[in-house]
Structure formats: structure tokens, C-alpha cells
Amino acid sequence: MRKIAIYGKGGIGKSTTTQNTVAGLAEMGNKVMVVGCDPKADSTRLLLGGLTQKTVLDTLREEGEDVELEDIIKEGYGASRCTESGGPEPGVGCAGRGIITSVNLLEQLGAYDDEWGLDYVFYDVLGDVVCGGFAMPIRDGKAQEIYIVVSGEMMAMYAANNICKGILKYADAGGVRLGGLICNSRKVDNEREMIEELARQLGTQMIHFVPRDNMVQRAEINRKTVIDFDPSHNQADEYRALATKIDQNEMFVIPKPLEIEELEKLLIDFGIAN
């Protein structure tokens, strides 16, 4: 079983990218579980056809300790297993702590057991690695591979670099490695070349360049992944290609984060900061 965490700046398209990739892996015959680690609880919506899933923390709050696995896991597209950790009530408590509680409960209830025949577990993790709770999949060895969703925008690259610092910090203790950058295009000038160069300087690869296409939004409005909504569309093939590359990936590294001056130089060299 491969355990993968998807990180990236807030709003970069992590949840969309994760769910479309999972659809591609499921279509290939893989058994996949998705653990949403975001208080918004939108990490599994497209796989579940728009159903808003009751989160682990909400279930715990309402049911107490008497929770069964089927209360918190729903079956989605391609027999994927979907669960959302959720978060505390707004203004109360720590969302990162909620992720720790949720993942521990999933382990106790046997969500990762061999009987489920899982090939992959995906953690879709909120935003930047800003607090210990969100770093948990890296820190505690819950995830072995990290993929960072990035674009050619400065803050997305800045966040990717910060996430690499987190991976570096926990690489020895948790054994986690960076599998690559996924460029979710924003149609920035020289975007592909810039992210390839960022990946090179970090010591990793740009595993796939996902072009911008309105089909992604159309599928989302219809509460589906692109592969589910329009399987013959070019964008569906892009996600299939990304799924295949992740499936076949053998490049796992401890990244070399850039200094802020190096990152700014990269932006200047590719014409963004001019």
C-alpha cells in the first residue's frame, strides 16, 4: 500500500487534482482510500457525486466514542473509499489536532487493514505546512510520498518551497520523500519551463503539467471528476496520464529547499517579477 499526501497553497486545486487522479487510479483497477485533511471537507465530494459527507469529528461529537467504520467511510467512484476528518467549530480548537484525532481513529477502526486490499491511501492536506497538525502525515510517517500542487504564481511557488522545508525536517524521522511537483496551470507566462526549473533546483521532477481547461469546472458543477463526467475529453486523459506517472514513479527524494533570494531570482529569470 502506497501512502501519498498532496500538499500545496490554499486554492491551488489540491482537492480537484487529488480526486481526478484518484479516479484515474481507480479506473486502472487500483483500490484507493482518500482521507480529506481539510476542515472544509471538500476532498471527496466529486468522488461521491456531490454528497457532503459527515466528517469524522462531527460524527465523534454527535455519537461519542461509539463510532463504527461505516459511519465515517463512504464508497465513491471506482469503489474508492472516502472519509473526511473535518475540523473544530469555527473559532474553537485546532484543525490540525482534528486531523491527528481522525487518522488515529481510522487506524483504531481498521480502515487500513489488509482486508480492504488497498493499493493507495491519499491524504489531501490543507494549505501550507503551517502547524504541526497539518504536518502530521509527514511527521508521523503516515505518508511516504508527497506530491506538491503548484503553479507559476509566486505564492504557490513560495508555499511549495516551504512544504519542502517541512519534508526536509521530517525526512529522517518519518522516512517521507518528495515524489514531484504537479503543475496545475494558471496560464502564467513560461509556466511549464519555470516549474521544471523549480523542480530541478529542489532536486525533484515536475511529474505532470495539467493544462487549464474549463471542463474541470464543468465537471465540478455536475459534482463529478472529469473522468466520470466526460471520459473521452482531453482533460480526462491528462488526469489519466498523471495517475499513470504517479503509479510508475520511482523518483523519491529529500528536497533541497531554496533560499528566498534564489526563488526570487527564478521568478526574475522567467520574467514574472519584471
From Swiss-Prot:
Keyword Nucleotide-binding: yes
Entry keyword set: 4Fe-4S, ADP-ribosylation, ATP-binding, Iron, Iron-sulfur, Metal-binding, Nitrogen fixation, Nucleotide-binding, Oxidoreductase
Cofactor note: Binds 1 [4Fe-4S] cluster per dimer.
Catalysed reactions, semicolon-separated: N2 + 8 reduced [2Fe-2S]-[ferredoxin] + 16 ATP + 16 H2O = H2 + 8 oxidized [2Fe-2S]-[ferredoxin] + 2 NH4(+) + 16 ADP + 16 phosphate + 6 H(+)
Mod. after translation: The reversible ADP-ribosylation of Arg-97 inactivates the nitrogenase reductase and regulates nitrogenase activity.
ADP-ribosylarginine modified-residue sites: R97
List of residues binding ATP: G8, K9, G10, G11, I12, G13, K14, S15
Highest rank taxon of the organism: Bacteria
GO MF entry, a single one: 4 iron, 4 sulfur cluster binding
Binding site for [4Fe-4S] cluster: C94, C131
InterPro entries per UniProt: NifH/chlL_CS (IPR030655), NifH/frxC (IPR000392), Nitrogenase_Fe_NifH (IPR005977), P-loop_NTPase (IPR027417)
HAMAP family: NifH
Name of the protein this chain belongs to: Nitrogenase iron protein
Biological classification of the source: Bacteria, Pseudomonadati, Chlorobiota, Chlorobiia, Chlorobiales
Gene, per the UniProt record: nifH
